């Protein structure tokens, strides 16, 4: 990506203040935000991210997820993100795929995919996810 695209991505991610800083001076969370900005700067039609919210506090987790949702909704970017935080996934993405042993065992709207039974079967924990999921 060229400098203008990187600058625009830093602004979009909300980390203009980090421009020009040495990566060794950044916290893990700041480094993660820079990586997200660099991915966004590519302006690719498909964005593949592995744990884009790792090392981030709640405010920045939400900001990154809102950015990804905005990229999908307004820029037409397809976002494929690996997330282990089921609450974030079900709140921000209208379609989820649940993998078990590397295979897709469920695919669809969060409310249909992340049932208590499926979470128990796949993740081995008995929890009920509450709140209205994205996309029903």
Regions found by a protein language model. Give the residues of each.
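Conserved ABC ATPase signature
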Residues: 22-26, 30
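Helical segment within the ABC ATPase nucleotide-binding domain
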Residues: 61-75
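Catalytic Walker B motif of ABC-type/P-loop ATPase nucleotide-binding domains
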Residues: 47-51
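ABC ATPase "signature
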Residues: 107-108
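Conserved ABC ATPase "signature" region
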Residues: 2-18
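ABC ATPase nucleotide-binding domains
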Residues: 115-136
């Amino acid at each position: 990506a060229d400098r203008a695209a990187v600058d625009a991505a830093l602004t979009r991610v909300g980390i203009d203040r980090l421009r020009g800083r040495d990566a060794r001076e950044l916290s893990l969370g700041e480094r993660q935000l820079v990586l997200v900005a660099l991915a966004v700067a590519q302006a690719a039609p498909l964005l593949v991210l592995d744990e884009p919210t790792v090392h981030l506090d709640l405010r920045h987790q939400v900001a990154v997820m809102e950015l990804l949702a905005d990229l999908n909704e307004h820029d037409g970017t397809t976002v494929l993100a690996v997330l282990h935080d089921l609450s974030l996934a079900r709140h921000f993405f209208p379609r989820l795929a649940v993998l078990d042993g590397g295979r897709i065992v469920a695919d669809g709207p969060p409310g249909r995919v992340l049932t208590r039974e499926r979470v128990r079967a796949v993740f081995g924990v008995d929890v009920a996810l509450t709140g209205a999921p994205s996309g029903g």
